[in-house]
Amino acid sequence: IEGKPVPPDPAEIARREAEACADAEKRERQALACWREAQPIGSTIAETYLRNRGITCELPDTLRFHPECWHGATARRVPAMVARVDGLPRFAVHRTYLRPDGSGKADLTPNKAMLGRTAGGAICVCDEPGPLVVAEGIETALSLSSGLIRRPATVWAALSAPGIAALQLP
């Protein structure tokens, strides 16, 4: 009948939901593999990158370094800082691709990428007693932990403005 909306086909809905679930599981496996392949950040070009940006605080174990992280847009492996995103139902990471000497971000597009669904999660860069401070980016959060905040605080990076809006607070 003309003008009446057609109800969605239950089989098509089920197919799309199964596809979305399979994709989420695949991305979670990829994120977990990326995290496991990465090494502690100390004495790596990821630490060099952060120190060159004036970050002086102790670097958290939520940050690691991957010497050959996959960059899908260019189909090649590039050094990257890998950050674990917590507070989510599935495992996810954020990658910042770096120049080989750690002097800055890699000259790639994009030079930052998320793997897995990150909305609602955050990277804890400092877990001290005190207020919760939420920043958009990892470097901003680390800068706050490097002395811009005058008292102890828990500092999170929500990764984007929409990430801040979706953040699940304790």
Across the structure, where does each feature detected by a protein language model lie?
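Short, small/acidic-rich helices and loops at N termini and domain boundaries
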Residues: 1, 64-68
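Non-catalytic accessory segments of DNA primases and related replication-initiation nucleases
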Residues: 1-52
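N-terminal structured subdomain of primase-like DNA metabolism proteins
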Residues: 1-5, 59, 135, 148
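Short helix-to-loop capping/linker segments positioned immediately adjacent to catalytic or ligand/cofactor-binding
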Residues: 37-38, 70-73
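Short, hydrophobic/aromatic alpha-helical segments in well-folded domains
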Residues: 46, 65, 140-143
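Serine endopeptidase catalytic core focused on the charge-relay Asp
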Residues: 50, 54-55, 85-86
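A conserved helix-loop-beta module that forms one wall/lid of the active-site cleft
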Residues: 55-61
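Phosphate-handling DNA/RNA-contact segment within nucleic-acid enzymes
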Residues: 72-170
